[in-house]
Curated annotation (Swiss-Prot):
It comes from Streptococcus agalactiae serotype V (strain ATCC BAA-611 / 2603 V/R). The gene is tilS. Ligates lysine onto the cytidine present at position 34 of the AUA codon-specific tRNA(Ile) that contains the anticodon CAU, in an ATP-dependent manner. Cytidine is converted to lysidine, thus changing the amino acid specificity of the tRNA from methionine to isoleucine. This is tRNA(Ile)-lysidine synthase. Its EC number is 6.3.4.19. One of its GO terms (molecular function) is tRNA(Ile)-lysidine synthase activity. Belongs to the tRNA(Ile)-lysidine synthase family. It is found in: Cytoplasm. InterPro entries: Lysidine-tRNA-synth_C, Rossmann-like_a/b/a_fold, TilS/TtcA_N, tRNA_Ile_lys_synt, tRNA_Ile_lys_synt_N.
Amino acid sequence: MYNTILKDTLSKGLFTAHQKVLIAVSGGIDSINLLQFLYQYQKELSISIGIAHINHGQRKESEKEEEYIRQWGQIHDVPVFISYFQGIFSEDRARNHRYNFFSKVMREEGYTALVTAHHADDQAETVFMRILRGSRLRYLSGIKQVSAFANGQLIRPFLPYKKELLPNIFHFEDASNASSDYLRNRIRNVYFPALERENNQLKDSLITLSEETECLFTALTDLTRSIEVTNCYDFLRQTHSVQEFLLQDYISKFPDLQVSKEQFRVILKLIRTKANIDYTIKSGYFLHKDYESFHITKIHPKTDSFKVEKRLELHNIQIFSQYLFSYGKFISQADITIPIYDTSPIILRRRKEGDRIFLGNHTKKIRRLFIDEKITLKEREEAVIGEQNKELIFVIVAGRTYLRKPSEHDIMKGKLYIENLEKR
C-alpha cells in the first residue's frame, strides 16, 4: 500500500517545495502509519522529518504514548517536539492548542510543511457532518489535500485512501473514539452503519460529492477571476446568482468571520441598496461601503488622537490630522489660505452630529453637504472641522475646502495658512 501512496505523492509533487516536514503524531494507527511511511521514503521524497506530539493528559495511556514516541524518535534519530494541553478540555480548545503548537514549531524550527494522517473516511465524515450542520454548498468540498498553513503548507498524503487499506501496525487505541459524546464518533459508529444498510456506497458517494463540489467552485472561481469583487460597478452589474457566489467567496477570505445565512442576506442587501453604509457584522468585523467600493474590515478601536480637539491661538502653529495650521503667521508651503474675521482661538476637530455651516443664503448640515458632494464614509471620518466662537468657519474633506460665507459687515483680521504634510 505504501508503494501506491508513494507513487501518488510523487506524481502530485506534494513535497517538491519542501525539505523539512513536521509530522503530527498522536499514536493512533493513522498517524503511526504516516510516520512509518514518511520515514521509510525520506530519500525518495527528498525530505527530512520531525515529530510533533500533544499530550492531552485526558487518558492514562497519554504518558505511554508520549514515552513511545520519544523513544521512537531517539532510536531513529528524528527530532520530537512535545506540548502539554492544560485547562478545561473541549474538542475546540484541544484543536486550537494543537495547531497553534504545530505552527510555533514550524516557525521556530524551520519546517515548511505540516503533515497529518487524514484519510478518505475522515473526508466522508467531515462532509456528512457539514450536511448535518446545514453548511453552505462550498464547504461540502470537505478537507483539501494541500492548504496554506503557518509559514508553509498543511499536506495530507493519505486523503484519497480509506483507513482499511492502511497496514495494521503497532499503535495505541484511543478509548474515547468509542464514546458517543462527540458528533464525529456518533457519525462513525452509529449513523454510518445504519445508513450503509440503505446505501453500502455511502462513504464513496460523500467523497464524490466533495470532489464534484471542489471542481464546481474551482470552475466558478476561474470564470469570475477578472471581476473586481469589491468594485461596486463590477459587482452590481453581475446577475444575482453571480453576486451571491462572489460575496461568499470574498467572505471566505476571513476565516474567523462566520456569518449565518441571514447575516449574509443582510450584507448582500446592503451592498445592493445602500450608497454609503458602515454596518457592524460580528466578531469585530464591519462592512464599509461607499459610492465606488465595499470592504469588510476588522474593527480597530479609535485612538484618543482621533477624538481629540486642538486649540489654535493667534500667531501660533498646530498640527492636526495630516495638516499644519499656522494662524496669522505666513508659511510659504501653504496649500490652503483661509481669511479669518475674528482673532479668537480656532478649535480644530472632527465632525460631530448636528454640525452646520453657513454658505451664504442658507445654513447647511455637514451631513447633507457630504451626501450632496458624494463624500465617502472614510473621507467623512477624516474630515477636519475649524470652529471659532462655536461657529463652523471651514471644512476640509477629500482634498476640498468649504468655507463659511462672511457677512457684508465682516472685516478680515488675519489669515489661516494650511499645509498638507502628506505632500512634503
